[in-house]
């Protein structure tokens, strides 16, 4: 007798007498359903929460207003490229990432560090305002060479790409917790084959490159000082949680020694 197993709103048969069809073949006929190559689990994509679209558009508009209003002009080419990178990141996120990830990131709970993500958002907005005032009005430290501004924009795009890659291959939560509801396991593919916390490496590079891309040494210093200690603290705290609570992570950490920077840390 063939027993159905229910995943999401579908019944999938583990065995079929003819032997011709496989579970993967059946799932290929179901839209927005995939097999996780690492865990063997089935994921059925639902719609992206509307609140995620609203938050993303609001965040983009906030960045644009903070930059151009503080600068007093919209005639800054690098600022438009900066915002275009933002827009591209949002679009790729909507098309590529699991909507369950978005639901997790906007859901309260977990073990938040002392410095909350809301405070980090406030710091980001503040550094946009500082950069705009510096470059567009007061010219305190707007002496970043043009080649370094464009190089920083490339670094920014690469950093966001690394972050999206990490989020795609492993469920990337905004809180520190073991995700038992998703059957969390150790992932050793993608960027996790080389460093244990590629998402934090991407975040570090974003914080270093953002102010430079906006032509402000002052904004760069402000953002770096305010955020890098938080990112390093969070990487260490998450490592401790995973070492004690996630089966197999200790062996993985022994194989992949580096948290963020291969050869350094």
Stretches found by the model and what they are:
Residues 1-4, 8, 12, 102-103:
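Short intrinsically disordered, low-complexity coil segments enriched in acidic
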Residues 193-201:
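Histidine-centered phosphotransfer motif of kinases
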